[in-house]
Amino acid sequence: MWSKKFTLKKLILGGYLFAQKVYCEDESNSIYGTWSSKSNQVFTGPGFYDPVDELLIEPSLPGLSYSFTEDGWYEEATYQVSGNPRNPTCPMASLIYQHGTYNISENGTLVLNPIEVDGRQLFSDPCNDDGVSTYSRYNQTETFKEYAVGIDPYHGIYTLQLYQYDGTPMQPLYLAYRPPMMLPTETLNPTSSATSTDDPSSNKKRSLRSLVRRSLENRHKTNAIKRQNTSFLTSNAIWYISAGMLGVGSLLFLAF
C-alpha cells in the first residue's frame, strides 16, 4: 500500500517537473530580446541614441540595458551616476552606447565585440567641466564569464543574470521586449572620406529644438513589442497545474 502511494506521488511530481521543463526549454536559455535593469527606464534603441545627429538621450533614471538578436548582434545602453566623495553635490554621470556582435563559447562565456567607430560616451563632471559635458568615441570589449536566464519568482518574467569576467554578478536584467528594440545591425557612423566634407550642408549645425524633436520622434521608430506571456504554459499556469496535481494526488493518497 505504501509503495503504491509513494509511486503515485513520484508520478505527480514528475508530471509537474516535465510540464515546467517543456515550458522553459524553448526560451529559458535564450538571451534573444531587450533586457533592462530594475529602474525600467533605460532601453536600447532610438530612444537612447540618435546616430544621425549623434545625440545621446538621457533617461529619467540610471540603469542598464542589453539587446541581443538571434543571429549574433547586440546593443548596449548604459546610464551611470556615481557620487563625488569630495563634493556630494557634484555627482558624475555617463551615458554609453555600443553595438556590435557577440559570441558564446562552449564553456558559456559571453563576449561582446563592439563596432569600434560606433561607440559613444557622454561624460558629465559638473564641478570640473564648467557645465560642458565631454562627448567622445567609446570602444570597450566586454567579457562575461557566464550568464543565466530564469524566471523571477515574484513577477513571473524572464531575468538575465550576467557575471563579470571574475565571476562577480551584475545587477539582474528583466526581459522588456521580444523581438528586441535596437538600432540597425550595421555600422552606423563609418569613417568619413575626404570628399564627404565638400558639401557645406554636411557641416551645418542643427538647432537644439530640432535635435530634441528628432529624439522624441525616434522613440516611436521601432518594430519591437512589449514582452507578454502568450504561451499557454505561463508561470501562473504552471502554478495552477502544480497546485491541481498536488490536490489530486492528496485525494488519491487518502482514497487508496
Curated annotation (Swiss-Prot):
Glycans are attached at residues 103, 107, 139. InterPro entries: Rot1 (IPR019623). It is a single-pass type I membrane protein. N-glycosylated. Residues 186-209 are annotated as: Disordered. Residues 25-235 are lumenal. It is found in: Endoplasmic reticulum membrane. GO terms for biological process: 'de novo' protein folding; budding cell apical bud growth; establishment or maintenance of actin cytoskeleton polarity; fungal-type cell wall biogenesis; protein folding; protein folding in endoplasmic reticulum; protein N-linked glycosylation; protein O-linked mannosylation. Its main location: endoplasmic reticulum. One of its GO terms (molecular function) is unfolded protein binding. Residues 1-24 form the signal peptide. The chain crosses the membrane at residues 236-256. Keywords: Endoplasmic reticulum, Glycoprotein, Membrane, Signal, Transmembrane, Transmembrane helix. GO terms for cellular component: endoplasmic reticulum; endoplasmic reticulum membrane. Residues 190-200 have a biased composition (Low complexity). Required for normal levels of the cell wall 1,6-beta-glucan. Involved in a protein folding machinery chaperoning proteins acting in various physiological processes including cell wall synthesis and lysis of autophagic bodies. Controls actin cytoskeleton polarization to the mother-bud neck and CLB2 protein stability. Present with 2360 molecules/cell in log phase SD medium. Belongs to the ROT1 family. This is Protein ROT1. It comes from Saccharomyces cerevisiae (strain ATCC 204508 / S288c).
